[in-house]
From Swiss-Prot:
Pfam families according to UniProt: 14-3-3
Subunit-level organization: Homodimer, and heterodimer with other family members.
Similarity comment: family membership: Belongs to the 14-3-3 family.
GO BP annotations listed: protein localization; signal transduction
The species this protein was found in: Xenopus laevis (African clawed frog)
Function as written in the Swiss-Prot or TrEMBL entry: Adapter protein implicated in the regulation of a large spectrum of both general and specialized signaling pathways. Binds to a large number of partners, usually by recognition of a phosphoserine or phosphothreonine motif. Binding generally results in the modulation of the activity of the binding partner.
Residue positions, PTM N-acetylmethionine: 1
Gene Ontology CC, one term: cytoplasm
Keyword Membrane attributed: no
Protein name as catalogued: 14-3-3 protein beta/alpha-A
Amino acid sequence: MDKSELVQKAKLSEQAERYDDMAASMKAVTELGAELSNEERNLLSVAYKNVVGARRSSWRVISSIEQKTEGNDKRQQMAREYREKVETELQDICKDVLDLLDRFLVPNATPPESKVFYLKMKGDYYRYLSEVASGDSKQETVASSQQAYQEAFEISKSEMQPTHPIRLGLALNFSVFYYEILNSPEKACSLAKSAFDEAIAELDTLNEESYKDSTLIMQLLRDNLTLWTSENQGEEADNVEGDN
């Protein structure tokens, strides 16, 4: 199958909501080694976001059930084994994406926005790994996530408009990383507020093409800020995930 056929198959899979097939097609496109177009880049991102998102959601549900079955050894063991199965699937998906990023996507990225997009993606997938990791493994994945986000953040600040949807999406996810993974609400709020304020100050630079995306992410930044700064930021904050 040539590149155009693989891309067509990915689009067909997306319409059928068969995201594993979509991811397989876009993985094959990436492994051809050429720099991806914006459309191909977005297809790859959507495919893997759905594939990993399903496992992250399952993992949270099963982990919750596992905790509630304390005192019932048989049921708890079943829940634990099932959680470990989902965990392995999630880790394999993340490692697949990180391998594509390290071997093809980041090295081949030439425009700053592509570099930021892929480094943000790298930060995201190390973050997903850190959600299910423990001990030394958790420390490593957290450090790798922060490093990728930070590198992307520095490029975005120097090369992109504050209203650019990729820059805003990065600020959104990096702030979620600070809040949920590093348990640093002050840093999370500071980062989200700066990104929001800088974008508001330059709203006139918004082009028609990205207006909808940018304003949606700005709304998510504001929603997170409202939640994080409210008094009852306990349990409900765990459900906040401003993934873009």
